[in-house]
Amino acid sequence: MQRDLILHIGTSKTGSTSIQRVMSRQRTALARQGLYYPASPGQESHVLLTMAAMADRRLYGSPDRPIWGGIGPDARLARFRDEFASEMAAIPAECRRIVVSAEQFSMLLRDTQSVQNLHDLLRPYADTMTVVVYLRRQDQHFASLFSEMLRWGDAQAPDLLTMQPYAQHGYNYVNLVNRWARVFGRRFVRPRLYSPVAGTRFDVVEDFLQVCGASLDLTALSSARVANSSISHAGQMLLVALAERIRSRDPAQGRNVQSPLWRKLTAATSAALPGTGWRPTQAEARAFVERYGASNELVRQRYFPKRQTLFDPDFSALPLQPVAVDDAALSDAATRLMAALGTVTGPQAAPPPDRQAGFDAVLDAMLAQAEAAARQHDGVAVAAARLAQTAGDRQRHRTALATRLQIDPANTAARLELAALYLEDGDRRAAAYCVGAVLRTHPGHPGALALQHRLAATSSAPH
């Protein structure tokens, strides 16, 4: 039976999240049309496939990242490979096309070996594979990316020149396309332009569905397609200032301020202060795009020969001069954010007396809110774990314990309970990770030592 696979690799800020939300929420409708959207690599984004393919383990990040489910990268990826193989083996015969999507493919698979690893993971399940990648004019991409950088904790004043590290692997589009073409074959790589005609309506979800050969009624899915909305310019600058305040309080804090506190702060800012964010000037944007003129031209010649230029060369919608956010706008943003946090009420609340007082008030309120939220979230996770335990639902029990560890990675009780569950299920790798994590911080912990002894006993038991 012939089966093909469409591999959507991003890039970022080209509607990937909207595509993934629609695909994940319409799995049944897609299956009726012969398309299969896997769930084991992720309910929406298939980020676990990215992690499984990465040759550079340094990109895994902290072993306590939510993606690792409380058991670290090695154990989680081992479980994923088993789950993925089982899911692929059970694809209904009538599904002749598999669709895989994650913008992290283009962001994190930065070398040919990583791309080859992904190819080898997917090759057993498809006779042909086609890579789809959306490209966006570089200055427009960065302006959109800035809000995301703030959410990630990389809170610096916007400057196109500071993007050089990203640009080396992200904005040279001919290098990006060639890396995937070397592995999958040039005729199986299909670049698409994000909003290819200036001033016309472009819907990336509709475009991708057309590429997949699918048809869905999208009128009832409008809410699913709104994702990663921009933060207003004042909100962005407020976050930059708050990040500076966090760094000043903690001299050991590095450039990145990502933390549960920061995630809550950026979520509140996104909700309270949406709008058009920072934009470069016309001259800045033009100079930035011109850096990649040769690369863009090669992509145009190879894949878009009928176009005069790869991207629309019109920069007139951008400001001529830099747009600054004054103290009054920042104070207003701080007041609105505090109202969203529940620390002030009503539109008549007095603004902070000056800029620094506003920042300090928001940060202090945020710290108090984060502590209260952490207690509340942990209480919910505790209740969920107990309910799942009572019901005998081991998967939900594990998920609730992993949630507790996301809230507090130092929660030894939750980690040991999770270890015991995995040991009972026969997953020694996951159990060993949890036990080792406790013993690294609490070398003589009796509960951890007891589980370590059980692990040793199971490894030496006759089979």
What is each of the regions a protein language model found here?
Residues 1-381, 386-390, 420-424, 458:
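Anion-recognition interface
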Residues 369-370, 403-404, 437-438:
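Canonical positions in the second alpha-helix
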